[in-house]
């Protein structure tokens, strides 16, 4: 395993650990999710370029589209929760209330 792959994998693991440890605030959870998506994007791009997968060139672009949709929905949820409750605590999210 080269140093590039090791650093990208370490970035993914650090983002995952941050997501598991700092679950109380929605903003920190969203930032950790974005870090995970960024490291997945870089890992996928480096793998495709190193192995010359010509048929998989669109996969990183599709991953970025899903990451942008996830970020937009996460920010929408953050704004709605902070306007309703005044804080961005995850404990304020109760899916049973309509």
Curated annotation (Swiss-Prot):
Keyword hit for Electron transport: yes
A Pfam family found in this protein is Oxidored_q2
Membrane topology label = Multi-pass membrane protein
One of the record's GO molecular function terms:
NADH dehydrogenase (ubiquinone) activity
Which top class of enzyme applies to this chain?
translocase
Q: Which reactions does this protein catalyse?
A: a ubiquinone + NADH + 5 H(+)(in) = a ubiquinol + NAD(+) + 4 H(+)(out)
Cellular localisation = Mitochondrion inner membrane
**Tagged with keyword RNA-binding:** no
Query: Where is the chain membrane-spanning?
Result: 1-21, 29-49, 61-81
Cellular component per GO, a single term: respiratory chain complex I
> According to the UniProt entry, what is the EC number of this protein?
7.1.1.2
Q: What keywords are assigned to this protein?
A: Electron transport, Membrane, Mitochondrion, Mitochondrion inner membrane, NAD, Respiratory chain, Translocase, Transmembrane, Transmembrane helix, Transport, Ubiquinone
Give disulfide pairs as residue numbers.
none
Q: Name one GO biological process term.
A: ATP synthesis coupled electron transport
**Subunit-structure text:** Core subunit of respiratory chain NADH dehydrogenase (Complex I) which is composed of 45 different subunits.
Q: Which family does it belong to?
A: Belongs to the complex I subunit 4L family.
* Function of the protein: Core subunit of the mitochondrial membrane respiratory chain NADH dehydrogenase (Complex I) which catalyzes electron transfer from NADH through the respiratory chain, using ubiquinone as an electron acceptor. Part of the enzyme membrane arm which is embedded in the lipid bilayer and involved in proton translocation.
Protein name from the UniProt record: NADH-ubiquinone oxidoreductase chain 4L
Its ancestry begins with:
Eukaryota, Metazoa, Chordata, Craniata, Vertebrata
Q: Which gene encodes it?
A: MT-ND4L
């Amino acid at each position: 395993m080269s140093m590039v792959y090791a650093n990208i994998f370490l970035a993914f693991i650090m983002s995952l650990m941050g997501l598991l440890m700092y679950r109380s605030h929605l903003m920190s959870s969203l930032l950790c999710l974005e870090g995970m998506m960024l490291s997945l994007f870089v890992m996928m791009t480096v793998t495709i370029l190193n192995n010359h997968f010509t048929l998989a060139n669109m996969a990183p672009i599709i991953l970025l589209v899903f990451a942008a949709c996830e970020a937009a929905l996460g920010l929408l949820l953050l704004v709605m929760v902070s306007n309703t409750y005044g804080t961005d605590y995850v404990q304020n999210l109760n899916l049973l209330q309509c």
